């Protein structure tokens, strides 16, 4: 937050040259236009491959909400990304399984918009979507009600543990649906993250199901 340029240079210097953003606001990435950010990263020897973004559950006929997604996808494509990622579950908007299915329909439409811009759409999991609702796990409902050709899921390995599940369990249940991963380790109490290898996430078993998951990035 205090030294963006220094942080980016340090990341590139230690070998991180494929970046994922989480700072799209008002048509800009961390205050830079898509063209400016693309050049900025290229000058560092890096590129942006994905962008975390998102919206709540859109109401029927919410043209402003869909205009946001269309502009967002166009900007994300312009900056050079492959992935546009809904980063989180809008739990405040979800009161029933019907709402979860509406969200899945929304993701399918986001996937269509992404595809039209040469992108892939993904959903990044946190914890709330693993809390049972009307006898079902919302995360499962989202997977089962989205089009495999339009929507993939970005597994956050630590957040799965926080939710009481394991990565390989989901991969075995829904093969080919997890093309993008966030590799994070979880503390023994399951309440915070730690350095990879220092926690309780079983990375050996996770890497063993990478092909079955459909992992690309």
Task: Describe the role of every protein-language-model region.
Residues 20, 50-52, 85, 122, ...:
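Conserved beta-strand positions in the central sheet of alpha/beta enzyme cores
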Residues 4-7, 33, 37, 69-72, ...:
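Stable alpha-helical elements in mature extracytoplasmic
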Residues 1-15, 80, 133-155, 159-217:
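Histidine-acidic metal/acid-base catalytic patches
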